[in-house]
Amino acid sequence: MTIRYAVPDDVPALSAVEAECFPPAEAATAAEFAERVAHYGNHFWLMYDGDKLISFVDGFVTDDADLTDEMYENAVMHNENGAWQMIFGVNTLPAYRQHGYAGELIQKAIADAKEQDRKGLVLTCKDRLVHYYARFGFADEGVTDKSTHGNVACCLLYTSDAADEL
């Protein structure tokens, strides 16, 4: 398995994986991925099995500690010098789930955020996934009123303080 950042040629594969992982109402389009990769391809963590994209994690950087719906749709909000790494999606093809691949990418995103001196990482998820992200040091901040994207309920936050408690 190879982990790397995204380039424009990855957009069709990103779109295909996203379409397998999320319902149409929640999935980002190829056009949205093209815009995201153009603005922050170095904040996409991709795992390839040979030449096949099997899993990816992505999100931009901002000074805002709250993940909002507008962020999903507006890649120009990315601020490379921002304090917080947002996580917009964690995607793994169904045939490759339960092998720890997404976890490896989450850990890489955390390591990169630490290396870049970010305050932490922010993601939203459905209730049933809170325990999964807790394994990586994310703390449940409760129900969010900042985002309804994908009918999420919980906002999770990872800070360097969380790493000290692991």
Task: Briefly describe each language-model feature range.
Residues 24-49, 58-77:
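Active-site rim helix/loop that mediates acceptor-substrate recognition in acyltransferases
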Residues 113-125:
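Conserved GNAT acetyl-CoA-binding A-motif
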Residues 158-166:
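Conserved small/polar residues in nucleotide/adenosyl-binding loops
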